[in-house]
Amino acid sequence: MTASNPLRDESQTRPGGQPLRGAHLDSTAQLMNAITSQLGSQLSLVSLDGTRRPVPPPLVLVGHGSRDPRALSTVRTLIERVRELRPHLSVHLGHIELNEPLLPDTLASLDPTGEAVLVPLLLSRGYHVKRDIPEAAAAVPGLRARVAAPLGPHPLLVETLYARLVEAGWRTRMSDAARRASGVVLAAAGSRDPEAAVDARRTAQLLAERLGVPVVPAYASTAAPTVPAALRAMAARGRHRVAVASYFTAPGRFATECAEAAPWISSAPLGTHPTMARLILHRYDQALATQATTEPALASA
């Protein structure tokens, strides 16, 4: 008996055993795409005069972590969008808690004598931005780390919030009567840090200017007012068409609870909106323009 060839894919042959010409086209195309992508990344680091540009420090996106599997999926997709915008940039993920890889493990995998820019996937100042992330960076001997500002407040975040509200049914044009009856509750996670509340109020102010209706921040935990309390206050002022704007980076328990409290419409979390990837790179570039330090930068436009 003649042994069969275990490498032959019988589904890719003509009757009689002759291989199809296109049998390996898919794998060849994938290989060529990979080579082209790698070559493009290498060429992007070479200037017009042929000299090689310095390799930019890796970007470490620091997520909070969540028990909701949708959150991890969202963050991974967001990282892919960042890589698409800047293919030559090395982008890594590290979590503060709950999900792997944890931030200390990610930092330990980097060149201990190199540089890194840590961009918090967080929307305001608070304990994680001020303590947890800088301490994790400082714990790696020799690593020259910069901690970027949190994502908010920033006009790009406001544009993302606006887009999510429109997706949920917010009318971009409304009568004066409808405008007088409308409002928005900006639903955030909450923090004991007073600067986090300052940042949330600033985002609410920017969103109010964008929408032309009152916007008040409210919180899922820890801080006041709660989302239900803010909704009641809006109703007491005659605002009965009130939307809940989800000020969360990804789906999770808090985002779900806040959405369920909405008397009218509620928007999806910020998620993988294209503007989010642009904002992450903006914070990265801002941090690169400052002296290397593990102290978090101040949020600014």
Report each predicted region and the residues it spans:
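Active-site-proximal alpha-helix that buttresses catalytic centers in soluble enzyme cores
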Residues: M1-A301
